[in-house]
Structure formats: structure tokens, C-alpha cells
């Protein structure tokens, strides 16, 4: 909860003054963090999906739910209703704990890291990033994984624009590319 206290004491005041808000309730905040791990061959091999669920459970501290295909796609050999990945939505204390772990531990462990692109905002202040290796998280034991998998992380804010979302994440020293 250290990062939440930092948000309450420093970030709120800094953003309120920067954007000239009348109330601190107008200041953008992080609402949720969504982790998604797609497992393309999950319909053929159930073990792959089990390993992905296990990895995501270790990373997030919460049990993920299995996502299923909405439509059948012949080229990808996917049928409607077949499992294709797993997903976790973090809110509250777990969200702040994961966000701190992401900024302080996981992102610095990325190989050849030169900063995150600013272009990954969606137009409404939400930020998405993709991680190529799950082994950057300290909970994943390198010797026990079956395959290196990537995951998608979406940080959802209640910011009204990308400029506000960028200011919010930059206030937490999020490592954006200069």
C-alpha cells in the first residue's frame, strides 16, 4: 500500500495543481489493472492452459478465469466456446501491490529496456503494454516453467484524455521513453 499512500499524499496534489481542478475528486486515478495471457494452442493441449493459469496466478496473486473463443475461426483452428487464454482483473489492494511490483521490480528486469512507448494510450487515458517474457516477475521460477509466454497488461484509469493519463502514470515515475 506504499504506492497508494504516495498517490494520496503527492500525486493528487500535483495533478490537481497541474490541471487546475476545483476538487480532488476530478483528479484521475487508476481504476483497475487487467492481465491477459493468450494461449493459442490451448484447444489442442490442456496442459498449456493449466501452466498459463498457474503462471498468471503466481504473478497476480489472484486466480484467473479462462477466456473462451466468441467465434469460430477456421484459419486459426478455433471453435466457438473453446478455451483460448486466461485473464485477471485486479482492483483495490492487489492492484496497488501489483502496480508497485511492476514499476519497481518487473520492468527494470526487461532485457534491453529503453522505456515504454507513449503511443500505447487508447485515447481515453488507458495504457496497454505487452510483456514478452513472464520470467521478469520474481514469483516465476525460471527452472519450473515449460515455455516462455508473454502477457498483456492494461492499466485502466478514469482520465478523460491521454494527456491526463500520461501525467498520472508519469507522476508514479512510470518509465516512458523520452
UniProtKB/Swiss-Prot annotation:
Does the keyword Transcription regulation belong to this entry? Answer: no
- Asked whether the UniProt record includes Membrane among its keywords, one would answer no
| InterPro entries for this protein | Ribosomal_uL5 (IPR002132), Ribosomal_uL5_bac-type (IPR020930), Ribosomal_uL5_C (IPR031309), Ribosomal_uL5_dom_sf (IPR022803), Ribosomal_uL5_N (IPR031310)
Q: Name one GO biological process term.
A: translation
Any one GO cellular component localisation term in the record: ribosome
Q: Keywords on this record?
A: Ribonucleoprotein, Ribosomal protein, RNA-binding, rRNA-binding, tRNA-binding
Q: Which Gene3D superfamilies match?
A: 3.30.1440.10
A GO molecular function held by the record: rRNA binding
Q: Which Pfam families match?
A: Ribosomal_L5 (PF00281), Ribosomal_L5_C (PF00673)
SUPFAM superfamilies with a match to the protein in the record: RL5-like
Of which family is this protein a member? Belongs to the universal ribosomal protein uL5 family.
Subunit composition and interactions? Part of the 50S ribosomal subunit; part of the 5S rRNA/L5/L18/L25 subcomplex. Contacts the 5S rRNA and the P site tRNA. Forms a bridge to the 30S subunit in the 70S ribosome.
Xref: HAMAP family: Ribosomal_uL5_B
Q: Which named protein is this?
A: Large ribosomal subunit protein uL5
Gene that specifies this protein? rplE
